Protein backbone atom coordinates (compact mmCIF):
# COMPACT_ATOMS: atom_id res chain seq x y z
CA UNK A 1 0.00 0.00 0.00
CA UNK A 2 2.74 2.47 0.93
CA UNK A 3 1.79 6.10 0.29
CA UNK A 4 0.89 5.80 -3.39
CA UNK A 5 -2.16 7.82 -4.39
CA UNK A 6 -2.11 10.11 -1.36
CA UNK A 7 -4.00 13.33 -2.00
CA UNK A 8 -1.05 15.61 -1.19
CA UNK A 9 1.22 14.30 -3.92
CA UNK A 10 3.89 12.93 -1.58
CA UNK A 11 6.29 10.68 -3.49
CA UNK A 12 9.30 8.73 -2.30
CA UNK A 13 12.18 7.77 -4.55
CA UNK A 14 12.49 6.83 -8.19
CA UNK A 15 12.50 3.03 -8.28
CA UNK A 16 9.36 1.18 -9.42
CA UNK A 17 7.10 -0.09 -6.65
CA UNK A 18 5.82 -3.62 -6.23
CA UNK A 19 2.21 -4.52 -7.01
CA UNK A 20 0.98 -3.94 -3.45
CA UNK A 21 3.83 -1.64 -2.37
CA UNK A 22 4.23 -3.88 0.67
CA UNK A 23 6.78 -6.36 1.98
CA UNK A 24 4.40 -9.10 0.82
CA UNK A 25 5.37 -8.33 -2.78
CA UNK A 26 8.30 -10.62 -1.98
CA UNK A 27 6.75 -13.99 -2.94
CA UNK A 28 5.74 -16.06 0.09
CA UNK A 29 5.99 -13.27 2.67
CA UNK A 30 2.76 -12.66 4.61
CA UNK A 31 1.79 -10.52 7.61
CA UNK A 32 -1.01 -10.83 10.17
CA UNK A 33 -2.35 -8.81 13.08
CA UNK A 34 -4.29 -9.19 16.30
CA UNK A 35 -5.41 -5.78 17.56
CA UNK A 36 -6.56 -4.96 21.10
CA UNK A 37 -8.45 -1.65 21.13
CA UNK A 38 -10.64 -1.15 24.20
CA UNK A 39 -10.29 1.94 26.37
CA UNK A 40 -6.94 1.89 28.15
CA UNK A 41 -5.93 -1.26 26.26
CA UNK A 42 -4.38 -0.15 22.98
CA UNK A 43 -1.88 -2.77 21.88
CA UNK A 44 -1.56 -5.99 19.90
CA UNK A 45 0.59 -8.46 18.02
CA UNK A 46 1.86 -8.53 14.45
CA UNK A 47 3.35 -11.65 12.85
CA UNK A 48 5.45 -12.03 9.70
CA UNK A 49 5.92 -15.36 7.92
CA UNK A 50 9.10 -15.39 5.78
CA UNK A 51 7.69 -18.05 3.45
CA UNK A 52 4.80 -20.48 3.24
CA UNK A 53 6.80 -23.64 3.86
CA UNK A 54 8.28 -25.08 7.06
CA UNK A 55 10.55 -22.26 8.21
CA UNK A 56 12.32 -24.46 10.77
CA UNK A 57 13.29 -27.11 8.24
CA UNK A 58 13.78 -24.59 5.41
CA UNK A 59 15.61 -21.75 7.11
CA UNK A 60 16.28 -18.51 5.26
CA UNK A 61 19.56 -16.64 5.27
CA UNK A 62 19.29 -13.62 7.55
CA UNK A 63 21.22 -10.89 9.32
CA UNK A 64 20.55 -8.18 11.87
CA UNK A 65 21.98 -4.80 12.72
CA UNK A 66 21.54 -2.69 15.84
CA UNK A 67 21.64 1.03 15.04
CA UNK A 68 20.88 1.98 18.66
CA UNK A 69 20.47 -0.82 21.16
CA UNK A 70 17.80 0.50 23.53
CA UNK A 71 15.61 -2.55 22.91
CA UNK A 72 14.61 -6.02 24.02
CA UNK A 73 14.31 -7.93 20.73
CA UNK A 74 15.03 -11.65 21.15
CA UNK A 75 16.82 -14.04 18.83
CA UNK A 76 19.41 -11.71 17.31
CA UNK A 77 22.45 -13.44 18.84
CA UNK A 78 21.81 -16.68 16.95
CA UNK A 79 20.85 -14.87 13.75
CA UNK A 80 24.19 -13.09 13.79
CA UNK A 81 26.14 -16.26 14.63
CA UNK A 82 24.49 -18.71 12.22
CA UNK A 83 23.13 -16.34 9.60
CA UNK A 84 19.68 -17.94 9.45
CA UNK A 85 16.10 -17.27 10.50
CA UNK A 86 14.04 -20.31 11.55
CA UNK A 87 10.78 -18.89 12.95
CA UNK A 88 8.19 -16.29 12.04
CA UNK A 89 9.03 -12.79 13.28
CA UNK A 90 6.71 -11.38 15.95
CA UNK A 91 6.14 -7.76 16.98
CA UNK A 92 4.45 -6.63 20.19
CA UNK A 93 4.83 -4.25 23.14
CA UNK A 94 7.88 -4.32 25.39
CA UNK A 95 6.35 -6.09 28.38
CA UNK A 96 4.68 -8.75 26.23
CA UNK A 97 7.89 -10.10 24.69
CA UNK A 98 7.94 -13.03 27.13
CA UNK A 99 4.34 -13.99 26.40
CA UNK A 100 4.93 -13.72 22.66
CA UNK A 101 8.10 -15.80 22.86
CA UNK A 102 6.35 -18.56 24.82
CA UNK A 103 3.53 -18.62 22.28
CA UNK A 104 5.94 -18.71 19.35
CA UNK A 105 7.83 -21.62 20.93
CA UNK A 106 4.54 -23.52 21.35
CA UNK A 107 3.62 -22.73 17.74
CA UNK A 108 6.94 -24.10 16.52
CA UNK A 109 6.78 -27.20 18.76
CA UNK A 110 3.34 -28.06 17.41
CA UNK A 111 4.55 -27.82 13.83
CA UNK A 112 7.90 -29.53 14.45
CA UNK A 113 7.76 -32.56 16.79
CA UNK A 114 11.49 -33.14 16.26
CA UNK A 115 12.49 -29.95 18.14
CA UNK A 116 14.26 -30.93 21.40
CA UNK A 117 13.50 -34.60 20.71
CA UNK A 118 15.64 -35.72 17.80
CA UNK A 119 17.22 -32.35 17.01
CA UNK A 120 18.16 -29.13 18.78
CA UNK A 121 16.09 -26.23 20.09
CA UNK A 122 14.52 -23.30 18.25
CA UNK A 123 15.40 -19.60 18.10
CA UNK A 124 12.21 -17.49 18.44
CA UNK A 125 12.48 -13.93 17.15
CA UNK A 126 10.29 -11.36 18.92
CA UNK A 127 10.61 -7.60 18.34
CA UNK A 128 9.16 -4.88 20.55
CA UNK A 129 8.42 -1.20 21.04
CA UNK A 130 7.14 0.50 24.19
CA UNK A 131 3.49 1.59 23.79
CA UNK A 132 2.98 2.78 27.39
CA UNK A 133 1.84 6.23 26.25
CA UNK A 134 -1.48 4.94 24.89
CA UNK A 135 -1.61 1.44 26.32
CA UNK A 136 -1.94 0.13 29.87
CA UNK A 137 1.25 -1.82 29.31
CA UNK A 138 1.51 -2.81 32.99
CA UNK A 139 -1.76 -4.71 32.63
CA UNK A 140 -0.02 -7.33 30.45
CA UNK A 141 -3.11 -7.67 28.27
CA UNK A 142 -1.48 -9.59 25.41
CA UNK A 143 -2.03 -13.34 25.74
CA UNK A 144 -0.71 -16.34 23.87
CA UNK A 145 -4.07 -16.62 22.11
CA UNK A 146 -3.52 -13.16 20.64
CA UNK A 147 -0.19 -14.34 19.24
CA UNK A 148 -1.80 -17.42 17.70
CA UNK A 149 -4.51 -15.18 16.21
CA UNK A 150 -1.91 -12.93 14.56
CA UNK A 151 -0.09 -15.94 13.12
CA UNK A 152 -3.36 -17.34 11.77
CA UNK A 153 -4.21 -13.97 10.21
CA UNK A 154 -1.10 -13.80 8.03
CA UNK A 155 -1.87 -12.83 4.42
CA UNK A 156 -0.39 -10.83 1.57
CA UNK A 157 -2.95 -8.00 1.70
CA UNK A 158 -2.49 -6.87 5.30
CA UNK A 159 -3.51 -3.61 7.00
CA UNK A 160 -1.16 -0.78 7.97
CA UNK A 161 -1.29 1.96 10.58
CA UNK A 162 -2.73 1.58 14.09
CA UNK A 163 -3.15 -2.19 13.88
CA UNK A 164 -1.59 -5.19 15.58
CA UNK A 165 1.59 -4.31 17.43
CA UNK A 166 1.27 -0.80 16.02
CA UNK A 167 -1.98 -0.01 17.81
CA UNK A 168 -0.43 1.99 20.66
CA UNK A 169 2.67 3.36 18.97
CA UNK A 170 3.66 7.01 18.51
CA UNK A 171 5.85 8.15 15.61
CA UNK A 172 7.24 11.69 15.39
CA UNK A 173 4.74 12.73 18.05
CA UNK A 174 1.83 11.49 15.91
CA UNK A 175 0.02 8.18 15.64
CA UNK A 176 2.41 5.63 14.22
CA UNK A 177 2.38 1.85 13.92
CA UNK A 178 2.80 -0.59 11.06
CA UNK A 179 4.05 0.62 7.68
CA UNK A 180 5.33 -1.16 4.60
CA UNK A 181 6.64 -0.56 1.09
CA UNK A 182 8.43 -2.37 -1.72
CA UNK A 183 10.64 -1.71 -4.72
CA UNK A 184 11.48 -3.68 -7.86
CA UNK A 185 15.10 -4.04 -8.97
CA UNK A 186 16.22 -5.61 -12.24
CA UNK A 187 19.25 -7.91 -12.21
CA UNK A 188 20.48 -9.73 -15.31
CA UNK A 189 17.24 -8.84 -17.06
CA UNK A 190 15.02 -10.32 -14.34
CA UNK A 191 12.86 -8.38 -11.83
CA UNK A 192 13.42 -8.91 -8.11
CA UNK A 193 11.69 -7.38 -5.12
CA UNK A 194 12.91 -5.59 -2.01
CA UNK A 195 10.37 -5.01 0.76
CA UNK A 196 10.32 -3.36 4.17
CA UNK A 197 8.01 -3.41 7.17
CA UNK A 198 8.38 -1.10 10.16
CA UNK A 199 6.89 -0.82 13.62
CA UNK A 200 7.32 2.93 14.18
CA UNK A 201 7.45 4.41 17.67
CA UNK A 202 10.22 7.00 17.56
CA UNK A 203 11.45 10.52 16.78
CA UNK A 204 10.16 14.09 17.20
CA UNK A 205 7.33 15.99 15.49
CA UNK A 206 9.42 19.06 14.68
CA UNK A 207 11.93 16.84 12.86
CA UNK A 208 9.40 15.01 10.67
CA UNK A 209 10.10 15.24 6.95
CA UNK A 210 7.51 13.86 4.54
CA UNK A 211 8.89 13.27 1.04
CA UNK A 212 11.34 16.14 1.47
CA UNK A 213 8.89 18.54 3.16
CA UNK A 214 9.33 19.54 6.83
CA UNK A 215 5.81 18.72 7.99
CA UNK A 216 5.56 21.48 10.61
CA UNK A 217 5.62 24.00 7.74
CA UNK A 218 2.31 22.57 6.48
CA UNK A 219 0.54 22.27 9.82
CA UNK A 220 -0.67 24.97 12.16
CA UNK A 221 -1.69 22.36 14.72
CA UNK A 222 0.29 22.30 17.94
CA UNK A 223 1.69 18.92 18.94
CA UNK A 224 2.58 18.73 22.66
CA UNK A 225 6.32 18.61 23.39
CA UNK A 226 7.63 15.10 23.90
CA UNK A 227 10.90 13.29 24.45
CA UNK A 228 12.66 11.44 21.67
CA UNK A 229 12.39 7.95 23.06
CA UNK A 230 10.69 4.83 21.81
CA UNK A 231 11.91 2.52 19.09
CA UNK A 232 11.54 1.53 15.48
CA UNK A 233 11.79 -2.04 14.27
CA UNK A 234 12.61 -2.56 10.59
CA UNK A 235 12.40 -5.86 8.73
CA UNK A 236 13.74 -6.16 5.18
CA UNK A 237 12.81 -9.03 2.88
CA UNK A 238 13.94 -9.85 -0.63
CA UNK A 239 13.95 -12.65 -3.18
CA UNK A 240 17.41 -11.65 -4.39
CA UNK A 241 20.03 -14.34 -3.66
CA UNK A 242 22.30 -12.78 -1.05
CA UNK A 243 24.71 -13.94 1.63
CA UNK A 244 24.23 -13.08 5.28
CA UNK A 245 27.13 -10.63 4.92
CA UNK A 246 25.31 -8.84 2.11
CA UNK A 247 22.06 -8.87 4.10
CA UNK A 248 23.85 -7.16 6.98
CA UNK A 249 25.03 -4.50 4.54
CA UNK A 250 21.40 -3.94 3.58
CA UNK A 251 20.46 -3.63 7.26
CA UNK A 252 22.92 -0.80 7.72
CA UNK A 253 21.31 1.15 4.85
CA UNK A 254 18.00 1.27 6.72
CA UNK A 255 19.45 4.25 8.58
CA UNK A 256 19.42 6.21 5.32
CA UNK A 257 15.65 5.82 5.04
CA UNK A 258 15.11 6.69 8.70
CA UNK A 259 17.20 9.84 8.43
CA UNK A 260 15.24 10.98 5.38
CA UNK A 261 12.13 11.15 7.58
CA UNK A 262 13.95 13.25 10.17
CA UNK A 263 15.09 10.68 12.70
CA UNK A 264 18.51 11.08 14.30
CA UNK A 265 18.23 7.87 16.37
CA UNK A 266 18.08 9.30 19.88
CA UNK A 267 19.52 7.80 23.04
CA UNK A 268 16.25 6.28 24.23
CA UNK A 269 15.21 4.86 20.89
CA UNK A 270 15.92 1.26 19.92
CA UNK A 271 16.62 0.98 16.19
CA UNK A 272 16.78 -2.71 15.28
CA UNK A 273 16.96 -4.05 11.72
CA UNK A 274 16.51 -7.64 10.51
CA UNK A 275 16.93 -8.70 6.87
CA UNK A 276 16.35 -12.02 5.15
CA UNK A 277 16.26 -13.48 1.66
CA UNK A 278 13.84 -16.14 0.51
CA UNK A 279 16.15 -17.10 -2.35
CA UNK A 280 18.81 -18.94 -0.38
CA UNK A 281 17.38 -21.50 2.02
CA UNK A 282 19.28 -23.74 4.38
CA UNK A 283 17.82 -27.19 5.07
CA UNK A 284 17.79 -28.19 8.73
CA UNK A 285 18.74 -31.70 7.66
CA UNK A 286 21.13 -32.28 4.77
CA UNK A 287 22.76 -35.43 3.44
CA UNK A 288 25.42 -33.30 1.78
CA UNK A 289 28.12 -31.32 3.53
CA UNK A 290 28.30 -28.71 0.76
CA UNK A 291 25.28 -26.64 -0.22
CA UNK A 292 25.06 -24.86 -3.60
CA UNK A 293 24.03 -21.20 -3.51
CA UNK A 294 23.73 -18.37 -6.00
CA UNK A 295 25.01 -15.01 -4.78
CA UNK A 296 24.83 -11.45 -6.04
CA UNK A 297 28.13 -9.92 -7.12
CA UNK A 298 28.95 -7.03 -4.78
CA UNK A 299 29.47 -4.71 -7.74
CA UNK A 300 25.73 -5.05 -8.47
CA UNK A 301 24.51 -4.21 -4.96
CA UNK A 302 24.06 -0.42 -5.24
CA UNK A 303 20.48 -0.59 -6.59
CA UNK A 304 19.60 -2.71 -3.55
CA UNK A 305 20.98 -0.05 -1.22
CA UNK A 306 18.80 2.52 -2.97
CA UNK A 307 15.79 0.20 -2.73
CA UNK A 308 16.30 -0.25 1.02
CA UNK A 309 16.54 3.50 1.60
CA UNK A 310 13.36 4.15 -0.40
CA UNK A 311 11.42 1.28 1.18
CA UNK A 312 12.28 2.25 4.74
CA UNK A 313 11.51 5.94 4.18
CA UNK A 314 8.15 5.15 2.62
CA UNK A 315 7.32 2.53 5.26
CA UNK A 316 7.71 5.09 8.05
CA UNK A 317 5.50 7.57 6.18
CA UNK A 318 2.98 4.84 5.40
CA UNK A 319 2.72 3.97 9.10
CA UNK A 320 1.83 7.61 9.76
CA UNK A 321 -0.55 8.21 6.86
CA UNK A 322 -2.55 5.01 7.47
CA UNK A 323 -2.98 5.50 11.22
CA UNK A 324 -6.11 7.06 12.68
CA UNK A 325 -6.21 9.23 15.81
CA UNK A 326 -6.29 7.03 18.93
CA UNK A 327 -7.10 7.92 22.56
CA UNK A 328 -6.02 5.49 25.25
CA UNK A 329 -4.49 5.21 28.70
CA UNK A 330 -4.81 8.28 30.97
CA UNK A 331 -6.85 9.95 28.22
CA UNK A 332 -3.74 10.45 26.11
CA UNK A 333 -4.36 11.05 22.41
CA UNK A 334 -1.98 10.53 19.50
CA UNK A 335 -3.23 12.36 16.43
CA UNK A 336 -3.39 11.10 12.86
CA UNK A 337 -1.13 12.81 10.32
CA UNK A 338 -3.73 12.25 7.62
CA UNK A 339 -6.45 13.92 9.69
CA UNK A 340 -4.20 16.86 10.52
CA UNK A 341 -3.33 17.38 6.87
CA UNK A 342 -6.98 17.23 5.83
CA UNK A 343 -8.00 19.72 8.52
CA UNK A 344 -5.13 22.17 8.16
CA UNK A 345 -6.05 25.81 7.62
Where are the model-predicted features located?
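Alpha/propeptide regions of enzymes that mature by internal proteolysis
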Residues: 1-345
Amino acid sequence: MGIAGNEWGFQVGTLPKGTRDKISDVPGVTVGHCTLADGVVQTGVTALLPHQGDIFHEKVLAASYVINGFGKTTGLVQIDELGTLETPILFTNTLSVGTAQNALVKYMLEKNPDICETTGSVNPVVCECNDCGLNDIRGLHVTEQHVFAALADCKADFAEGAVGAGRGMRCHGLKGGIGSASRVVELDGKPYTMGALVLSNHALFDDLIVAGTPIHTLLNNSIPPHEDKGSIITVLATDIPLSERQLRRLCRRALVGLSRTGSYCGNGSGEIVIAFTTANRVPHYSEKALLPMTLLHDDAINPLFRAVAECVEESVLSSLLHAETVTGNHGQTFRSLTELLKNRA
